[in-house]
Every structure is written in C-alpha cells, then in structure tokens.
C-alpha cells in the first residue's frame, strides 16, 4: 500500500497572506499525522514565500512520522538540511516568479551540481529524492548520480485537457515508475493530484509514496484536516 505524505505549505501561505501567526503549519502537521498521514512534506523556498525557517525547525522537533524537506539544490539549503536533519530531502527546481513548481529537474544537465549536493546530504544520513518529469532519461540520470528515490511530476497528467491526453500522460507515468523500480529507486509521485484524479495513478502500482498538499488543504478548509486526510488516504490505499 502506498504511503501518503501531506504537504502543509498552503497552511503557511494563508498565514503569510496576513502576516500573522496563524494558521500555524506546525499545528496542521500534527493534525495531519493524527488523521493518519504517513509523513509531512514542507518546501522551504529560497524566497520564504510560505514555509519559514522556524516552521522547519519546529516541525522537525514535533513530527512523529517522517519529515520530507523539499528544497532547491543550493549551498544554503543543503546547509539548512544538514543542520535540521529531515528524514528525507527532495531536490526541486525553483523559479522566483512561479506560483508553484512548474516542472522537474533536468538531472542530466545538472548532474555535477546535483551529485555534489546528493553526496553531502547522504553523508549526513539524509535520504535524497529528485523531483523529475516522467522521462526515462531523467530516471536513468537520477540513478547514475546516486539518488535514493525519485518523485515523478504528475502535473502534465493532472492538467490534461482531454481523455486521450490524460491516457497518454498516464502511460508516461507508468513507464517512469517501472523504470525507477527496475533500477532499484524508491518511486514517489506528486504535484496537482486531487481527490478526483488520484486513483488511476495509485492503481499503477510500484509507487511507494504520494506527496499531496493543495488539494488536501483546500478540502480541510471545508471539512477539517482529519476528514480531508482520511479521505485522501483511503483513495491512495484503496485504488
């Protein structure tokens, strides 16, 4: 059964919109765990637009499952990770003007820089995942430079405008998952997944973990964190 990592970034987004102390993503992370989340994901962006350094430190201290820290592959972020010691790091591309992460890392192009950071993180006892598009060359490149895991970007599947395109993107996801498994990589998936589109991806098999944020937090606003997490966990595990 696949695991569910709950991303609480958007709780911090609401807080930062008013410049106040609430809602607190630290509390949201605890509630998600109580509802059955298998892990907590947070993205400390270079511009600190939502998650702040204090959030990372406090969630690290209070999380009872496992903490996955998403971050750019920079010296600053690697230093923070080595200090805070999350259970896992997911390296992602960042653009200052993007609303959310727009695509996967070009591992083949950035292999030297990424390998340097991967080696440092692994020496610090931190598992490293790379956020990549469902492209077989990127899967192979991730394996070659020593990643422990890959997180496959599901955005193109989620944004597909018609059934034919969606089916094509689902095939790409399936092939990337199979390739990752064959190479011995842990395979995760995320980005744009909702209560309405998760099941075909969960049915692929071979995906160890789904990291989902916006959809869960959006539903939690209406029905509460407990119900929102439990409903998504049922979909992830019961496909």
From Swiss-Prot:
Protein's organism: Syntrophotalea carbinolica (strain DSM 2380 / NBRC 103641 / GraBd1) (Pelobacter carbinolicus)
Principal localisation: cytoplasm
UniProt: 1-deoxy-D-xylulose 5-phosphate binding residues: 9-10, 45, 50, 100
Signal peptide extent: none
Subunit structure: Homooctamer; tetramer of dimers.
EC number: 2.6.99.2
GO molecular function, one term: pyridoxine 5'-phosphate synthase activity
UniProt similarity note: Belongs to the PNP synthase family.
CC terms in the record's Gene Ontology section: cytosol
BP GO terms, sorted: pyridoxine biosynthetic process
Protein name: Pyridoxine 5'-phosphate synthase
Site annotation Transition state stabilizer: residues: 151
Pathway where it operates: Cofactor biosynthesis; pyridoxine 5'-phosphate biosynthesis; pyridoxine 5'-phosphate from D-erythrose 4-phosphate: step 5/5
InterPro entries linked: Aldolase_TIM (IPR013785), PyrdxlP_synth_PdxJ (IPR004569), Pyridoxine-5'_phos_synth (IPR036130)
Alphabetized UniProt keyword annotations: Cytoplasm, Pyridoxine biosynthesis, Transferase
Function: Catalyzes the complicated ring closure reaction between the two acyclic compounds 1-deoxy-D-xylulose-5-phosphate (DXP) and 3-amino-2-oxopropyl phosphate (1-amino-acetone-3-phosphate or AAP) to form pyridoxine 5'-phosphate (PNP) and inorganic phosphate.
Originating gene: pdxJ
Active site: 43 (proton acceptor), 70 (proton acceptor), 191 (proton donor)
Record has Transferase as a keyword: yes
PANTHER family hit by this protein: PYRIDOXINE 5'-PHOSPHATE SYNTHASE
Binding site for 3-amino-2-oxopropyl phosphate: 7, 18, 192, 213-214
């Amino acid at each position: 059964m696949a695991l569910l990592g709950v991303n609480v970034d958007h709780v911090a987004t609401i807080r930062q919109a008013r410049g106040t102390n609430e809602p607190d993503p630290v509390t949201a992370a605890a509630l998600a765990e109580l509802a059955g989340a298998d892990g907590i994901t947070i993205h400390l962006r270079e511009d600190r637009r939502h998650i702040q350094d204090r959030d990372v430190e406090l969630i690290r201290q209070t999380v009872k499952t496992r903490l996955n820290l998403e971050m750019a592959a920079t010296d600053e972020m690697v230093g923070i990770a080595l200090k805070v010691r999350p259970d896992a790091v997911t390296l992602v591309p960042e653009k200052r003007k993007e609303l959310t992460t727009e695509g996967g890392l070009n591992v083949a192009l950035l292999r030297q820089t990424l390998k340097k950071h991967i080696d440092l993180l692994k020496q610090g006892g931190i598992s490293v995942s790379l956020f990549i598009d469902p492209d077989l060359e990127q899967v192979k490149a991730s394996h070659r430079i020593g990643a422990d895991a890959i997180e496959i970007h599901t955005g193109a599947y989620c944004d597909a405008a018609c059934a034919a395109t969606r089916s094509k993107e689902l095939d790409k996801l399936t092939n990337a998952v199979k390739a990752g498994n064959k190479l011995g990589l842990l395979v995760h998936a995320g980005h744009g997944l909702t209560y309405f589109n998760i099941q075909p991806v969960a049915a692929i098999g071979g995906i160890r973990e789904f990291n989902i944020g916006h959809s869960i937090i959006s539903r939690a606003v209406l029905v509460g964190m407990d119900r929102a997490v439990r409903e998504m966990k049922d979909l992830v595990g019961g496909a």
